[in-house]
């Protein structure tokens, strides 16, 4: 008998904002996830180094998790001195949680770029992929991704509960068009970030003087 599935959401979280949290909340509720683990990256392999320190980003993620029932912080990637490869994290989690389906949460942009990920063909050997989509948007899938969807896409939530891994679920989320880059630019102007990130995170950013021009 398998345990209820859990969600895995990795990211730089520089800072964490509603573009990260809202799809994760919807996945938690729609898919019946027992918890959502937030994993801040230490060395993100696909983007520039973070603006804030690991300690500051971890503090913001912890504040965001405290405001959302079922959300917890997983620090394992911050403790590594190597790039934060998703496959390494999923392998570790699978060993720790052999009877728990793992649902790796990602955006559509990440799915479209999946063939550039380290050992991407192995991800479904350890987890399901839960992909946030935009209502009415028909993406132009690369051939490798289209083939992956043809073999692994599921139409039944129950599949994510009865199988440990191997399915892809396209989640029809409310659109949230916000990136950390745009948010940092807004914060640099001193504008009010209300409703764009959790109140406790906004307060922390103000107290620490983060994202202000040098």
From Swiss-Prot:
The keyword Nucleotidyltransferase applies. GO terms for molecular function: ATP binding; nicotinate-nucleotide adenylyltransferase activity. Disulfide bonds: none annotated. One of its GO terms (biological process) is NAD biosynthetic process. Pfam families: CTP_transf_like. It comes from the Bacteria. It catalyses: nicotinate beta-D-ribonucleotide + ATP + H(+) = deamido-NAD(+) + diphosphate. Keywords: ATP-binding, NAD, Nucleotide-binding, Nucleotidyltransferase, Pyridine nucleotide biosynthesis, Transferase. CDD domains: NMNAT. It is an enzyme of class 2 (transferase). Pathway: Cofactor biosynthesis; NAD(+) biosynthesis; deamido-NAD(+) from nicotinate D-ribonucleotide: step 1/1. Its EC number is 2.7.7.18. Belongs to the NadD family. Catalyzes the reversible adenylation of nicotinate mononucleotide (NaMN) to nicotinic acid adenine dinucleotide (NaAD). PANTHER family: NICOTINATE-NUCLEOTIDE ADENYLYLTRANSFERASE-RELATED, PHOSPHOPANTETHEINE ADENYLYLTRANSFERASE. This is Probable nicotinate-nucleotide adenylyltransferase. It comes from Aeromonas hydrophila subsp. hydrophila (strain ATCC 7966 / DSM 30187 / BCRC 13018 / CCUG 14551 / JCM 1027 / KCTC 2358 / NCIMB 9240 / NCTC 8049). The lineage of its organism: Bacteria, Pseudomonadati, Pseudomonadota, Gammaproteobacteria, Aeromonadales.
């Amino acid at each position: 008998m398998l345990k209820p599935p859990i969600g895995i959401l990795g990211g730089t979280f520089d800072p964490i904002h509603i573009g990260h949290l809202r799809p994760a909340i919807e996945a938690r509720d729609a898919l019946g996830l027992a918890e959502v683990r937030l994993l801040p990256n230490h060395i993100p392999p696909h983007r520039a180094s973070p603006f804030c320190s690991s300690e500051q980003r971890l503090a913001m993620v912890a504040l965001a998790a405290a405001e959302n029932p079922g959300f917890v912080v997983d620090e394992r990637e911050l403790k590594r001195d190597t790039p934060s490869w998703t496959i390494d994290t999923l392998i570790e989690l699978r060993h720790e949680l052999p009877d728990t389906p793992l649902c790796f949460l990602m955006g559509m942009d990440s799915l479209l770029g999946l063939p550039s990920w380290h050992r991407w063909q192995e991800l479904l050997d350890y987890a399901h992929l839960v992909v946030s989509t935009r209502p009415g948007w028909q993406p132009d899938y690369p051939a490798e991704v289209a083939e992956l969807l043809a073999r692994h896409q599921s139409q039944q939530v129950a599949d994510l509960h009865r199988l440990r891994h191997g399915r892809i679920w396209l989640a029809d989320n409310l659109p949230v068009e916000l990136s950390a880059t745009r948010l940092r630019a807004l914060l640099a102007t001193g504008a009010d970030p209300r409703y764009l990130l959790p109140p406790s995170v906004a307060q922390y950013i103000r107290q620490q003087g983060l994202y202000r021009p040098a």
